[in-house]
Structure formats: C-alpha cells, structure tokens
Amino acid sequence: MCRRNVILVFCASFALFFTFIIFGRYPGGRFAVLYENATGPSETRPLKAFISSSYFYPTSKSLGDNALALVMSVNLVQTPSFLTPYFQEIVISAENATSSAVVSTPFFRIIPHEQCQIMTIFATAQLLPNVKRIQMVSHDGLTDIPFSPPSAIKRDVVMCIAPLFVSEQWQNFLFAVHIYKKYGGFMNLYLISTINTFFAVMKEYEKEGYMKVQPWPKVNFPGVPMDIADTHGQIEFRSQTAAQTDCLLQYKESAQYLAFLDLDDVLIPRIAPTYIEEFQRIIKGKKPLAYFLYHKENYEAFVTPNSSQFSLKNMFGSLKCRNFRETGKSVIDPQNANYTWLHYPPVLVNGLEKYEVEENVITHLKTINWVEDEVKTGNGTIIEPMYYDNSSATIISSKDIKDIEDDLQRMRNKPEIKKLFAELPKIRYYSDLVLKCYNEKFYDYFYSGRYEKITCPGPQYCDFKQHPDITCMRVNATHIERETLSPVTYYYAKDPYFTDKMGCYAH
C-alpha cells in the first residue's frame, strides 16, 4: 500500500507560496492605483500592454452578445525609479459596415501579488454586431488589433496544459495524452520550445485529433528599455497565467469543463468512467461552483529511454507513491469564470463557491527516472499502481491500462509515427538543467526560510547551456516596434511559427 504521512506538508507548490506567505495582502480583482505618493519617484513610466488574447463572441452566455475578451500583460507595478500612471479603464473602438462605437471598460488584475513588475489583466466589453475592425484607444492615437472567434467545436472536457519549454519528457507526454483520450479529454498544449523529434511526434498526435499544439510567443515590447518594461525577468512563470486564461476564453462557449494542468499533472477519473461523468457527480447537489480543486499526490516513475521498448503498461507498473501532497489544480465550468491564475481563479464572483475534491487526486509525476532496467511486466501481467491512501485501492484498473496500452501500440504502428519514435531522445539533458536551476533559485530558498532571496519566478534565471547534439523547435513571431502613446502603448505578436534556428531556450 501507499501510506500517507500523518503530517502533510501544507504547501509544496512554489507558486502558491507567493500567494500565502508573501503576497496574501493583495486580493486581486479590479486594479486600483496604489501609488500617488508625491515623496516617491517623480518620473512617470509609460505603460506597455502586450495583448496575448483577443476573442470576439457574437453570442456568449456569460459575456453577453458581441463581446470582446482581452488578456494582456502590462507593466503595472511601480518600481523605485518610476511612478505608475493613473490608469483604471481601457477604451476600445469598434466598427462594422454601418456604424462605429467607443466603449470604456474596467480591467481586472489576475495575478494576486506584485513580485513581478508585469501583471496579467483581463478585460471585456460588448461592442457592435458583425464587427469588422477593433482598435485600442490611447489619448494620442489608435492601435488596430487582430481578433478571432473562440473555438466552436463542442467538447466535453479540455485539458489546458501550461506552456512547455526545452521539453524532452516524451514518456510523460505519451502517458498524459493517451490517458486524456481514453477518458474523454482533449489536450490543448501551449508550447514554447521542445526537442525537434518530440515536436514532430506532437504534431502527428495533433493530426490524429488527440490534441492541439498552440504556439506561445513571448511577451515583447520592441525598442522599449528594460527599466521601463522588463519582459525577460519580470513575468511570472513564462506568462502562464495568460496562457491558462487564453485557454479558458478559447473554449468558453464550446467546452463543458476545462482542467488546468502541467504536463506532469495527470488526472485519472476514479469516481466515474469518464471525466465529464466524474465532474458532473462532483457538482451534483452543491451550490454553484466557480471551480473545484484536485490536490496533487507525488509519484515516481521509471521509464526506458529506448522508444522501441517503451510501454505505458510498464510505466503504470513502475509508479510509486512518495507520500507528499502538493498544491492542486482546478477544474472550471467556463460559464462561471472569465480568467484564472496558476492554480485557480483568484476571486469568486456572483456568489459562486469553490470545492476541494476529496474523492480523487491528481497523479503528479514528480520524478521520472530514465533507466535501462525499467520495471517490466510479462505479456499477460498488468500491475495496477496503488492509490495514495491507506487502502488497497488502485489508481486505475488493469482493463483501462490495457486499453491505453493498445491505443499507444495502434499509434506507434502508423508508418510516420513509427519512424519518428525511433528518433526520440535517448538522453535527458535540459530537464536536469531546469530542475537544478529551480532548486537553486527558488525551492532551496523557500525550504530554508530565505524568502527575501526569491525574485519573480520563472526560467529566466536558468542557464540553458546548449548541447551540441540536441536541436529544438522554438516559437517565434513578428513583433513590431511602436510609437509611444499615452497612457498605454499596445503590442501583440503576429504570425507565430516554430523554427529550429533559435536554440533550446525558454522565452
């Protein structure tokens, strides 16, 4: 059995640590200007806003008809050198074939702390029907912005996977994507960079309908000095909050539920045969919920680096509970929230409540060991991994393991995928660099109580020393330098694409 420690660690998640230990005093919600101190800095910093998402909804149950939803990264937090301008509303201009309108709307801060200078915000406004042109209005100019419709393909459940960078854990990917397919989930994976052969496998799974690979370009203000807007060192976790909110907005009208996970957070239904049935059972008889939270239990896995020998059956059989609970992740009804932070929406609105799930947990693949002598089972033997508690319960049935393994074999026998599998990485290099960096820059400080040493969290402090034999696909896009407008200059990325000419890095 997999026994729990009597004393649970309250918070193993670095991200949640920021909320409760250091920044609990910042509640989130509508941004109010906090800095109008005449004794402080005298120079006002120009605001720069990067638009990550702009969706237009002809109809929406929660946003209203002809609604625009925006997700932006803005340098809102005051620095020692600059004042923050007085800025409370966004002004939007819209045109259709016959008329035009100008609308002012408040915005809402999503990130509930001020450790990073660049904040993620959300705004929405109802515009005109059949809109043809949308512009952001500044005092001294207009900025045309692109916009797109949300997804119209009906889905029960979408798994929103946080942005990956220098990713090489292909075994983890196969484990997750086949599990999600089995239980009725569609994976939307945000991607910054990954090993080129791993990327090619992802794209084949995208063609087969398992998932969507969504490029996640960096926040960029071309020509803007770093003391005005530091897009390298002052954005929390590779703009993960913006990515997760993008996923919520993208599937707002088409999915019944959205689960927000990292790739190594794998949710396996336990109280019902599918995700949608489990979620419906959880909410049954409860007051309306903004979200429900699954806690994470850490597991260790042992996998082969040789793709020709890799088996999901063997990977399941190798799982060992490590008696450590980490901060969970949320499942959201997209009609009940417009934005979300790393783990959950930062505020509850309209009398909605939250619920912590007790009937199931996320299987967190905290450690994935690449070993030549992995745990192997005979052709007819299936080992069911143990559930975390003191019972004899298991995470998954042998029948479901067999179904998932059969699905893997079906995919790998496709000629193109079979060829790509043979080229998957056999060494782990960047994963170890990132783990070492995060321990040195964040976790070691946290566990030793040296909280003052912790800065804006993210991979920007890691040294990605390039490996001569490893090539990565990395996202790029067109970014345009713009004339400064007051109080805000608006930017966005155009035409994102992946290239193998930019090295293996995060943003």
Curated annotation (Swiss-Prot):
Domain GT92: 155-444
Domain of life: Eukaryota
Keywords tagged on the record: Glycosyltransferase, Membrane, Transferase, Transmembrane, Transmembrane helix
Gene Ontology molecular-function annotations: glycosyltransferase activity
Topological relation to the membrane, as annotated: Single-pass membrane protein
Top-level EC class as recorded in UniProt: transferase
InterPro entries: Glyco_transf_92 (IPR008166), GTase_92 (IPR052012)
Pfam families (UniProt xref): Glyco_transf_92
Location (main, coarse): membrane
This protein's record includes keyword Transmembrane: yes
Subcellular location: Membrane
EC number: 2.4.1.-
GO cellular component, one term: membrane
Membrane-spanning parts: 6-26
Family: Belongs to the glycosyltransferase 92 family.
PANTHER family: GLYCOSYLTRANSFERASE FAMILY 92 PROTEIN (PTHR21645), GLYCOSYLTRANSFERASE FAMILY 92 PROTEIN-RELATED (PTHR21645:SF17)
Record protein name field: Glycosyltransferase family 92 protein C33H5.2
